[in-house]
Amino acid sequence: MSKFLIAIVEDDRHLLVALESLLESAGYEVLLYFSGEDFLVSDRLQDINCLISDIGLPGINGIELLRVVHASRPYLPVIIITAPREPALLQAAMDAGARKTFVKPLDSAALLNAIAAIQ
């Protein structure tokens, strides 16, 4: 059986590496991308089991990425993370189809629980 494959789209390299370490130590396979465009041109959308994306990305933002992803894979679980504590932004992510939203700094245990719940 193949591992649960998670794509992470995050422009903060330190957070990206920290998330990679956290998820790999929990047994997940991880793909890393620095922008929504990098992810979309990677041709891995059909392979992943979950997408974790920041909202504040250069170019296409996380909410726009979520909409593009759900246009071809409407049931793919997407977790959105963001720095600003703006309820309207988090609500927009949920309205666009995010399964869960998290505000930075991330609670590692809560993130792992959210991923476990969607497996």
Q: Each predicted region: which residue ranges?
A:
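Acidic catalytic/metal-coordinating carboxylates
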Residues: S35, N61-E64
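Short amphipathic alpha-helix used as the core "switch/output" element in two-component signaling
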Residues: I63-Y75
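Two-component/phosphorelay signaling modules centered on CheY-like receiver
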Residues: D12-L31
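Alpha4 helix (beta4-alpha4-beta5 surface) of REC/receiver domains from two-component response regulators
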Residues: E64, R85-K100
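Acidic, metal-coordinating helix/loop segments flanking the phosphotransfer/catalytic sites
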Residues: L32-C50
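C-terminal output helix
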Residues: A88, L106-A116
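The short loop immediately C-terminal to the conserved phospho-acceptor aspartate in CheY-like receiver
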Residues: I55-G56
